[in-house]
A protein has these predicted regions:
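Substrate-binding cleft of carbohydrate-active enzyme catalytic domains
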Residues: 1-183
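Flexible, acidic glycine-rich loops studded with aromatic residues
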Residues: 185-190, 200
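Conserved alpha/beta catalytic core and glycan-binding cleft of carbohydrate-active enzymes
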Residues: 192-198, 204-205
Length: 205
């Protein structure tokens, strides 16, 4: 689980703001004595690629294969905090302190999103030799897409018919990119539509 709304934990060399901004959280939601509140103690940190390569080597010596997860298009607030233009609104936000599901996800109509995600996947593949790469796909509300000019335009151009199928299209773009590198994709079951590529492994939770 390299990334989530609450922090991006892998060094990404091509996009350094992922680490200087995306790995820093101003507080954390906690539950104590039955009460839920935000502890404003700052939290930050990420693994360098060298550290992760060392972890991979340590695991391989013990016959363990580490499968990295980079969740898209949801659970990306840390990435969006670093690069707000990747969201539908483009508004500046902060790394999420609370748990739960955010309405802000990556914009499916923005070509820059596809470029950035592919670049990040390239760096993940450079570090992790695993046959599989997990793309998450769960808990991605479509509210922002429904009101986004670029998303609606892409939906119309591709004649997909629904925003759920737009997510299927998005995942397929990244599956094809990873397939060129000899990698296979895993996604959470609720992020896969009936028309998803049969080569994608569905993980049920």
């Amino acid at each position: 689980h390299l990334s989530d709304d609450q922090g991006f934990r892998m060094e990404i060399k091509k996009y350094p703001l992922v680490n200087t901004i995306g790995s820093v959280r101003g507080g954390s939601e906690v539950v104590s004595d039955g009460k839920r509140y935000v502890d404003e103690t700052p939290h930050e940190g990420y693994f360098t690629q060298d550290e992760l390569c060392g972890l991979v080597a340590y695991a391989q010596e013990r016959h363990i294969d580490i499968v990295p997860e980079f969740d898209v298009p949801g659970h990306c607030i840390a990435l969006i905090a670093a690069y707000p233009e990747l969201s539908c609104s483009g508004k500046v936000t902060e790394v999420r302190k609370k748990w739960g599901i955010s309405k802000d996800i990556l914009c499916a109509g923005n070509d820059k999103v596809y470029e950035v995600v592919r670049d990040i996947l390239d760096e993940i593949c450079d570090v992790f030799p695993s046959e599989y790469i997990h793309l998450g796909g769960d808990e991605a509300p479509k509210e922002r897409w429904c009101n986004c000019k670029l998303c609606k335009q892409r939906l119309s151009e591709l004649k997909l018919g629904s925003f759920e199928k737009l997510q299927t299209y998005m995942v397929e773009c990244f599956r094809e990119h990873l397939a060129e590198k000899g990698r296979k994709v895993i996604c959470w079951n609720d992020g896969l539509g009936d028309d998803a590529n049969g080569e994608i492994v569905s993980q049920v939770w």
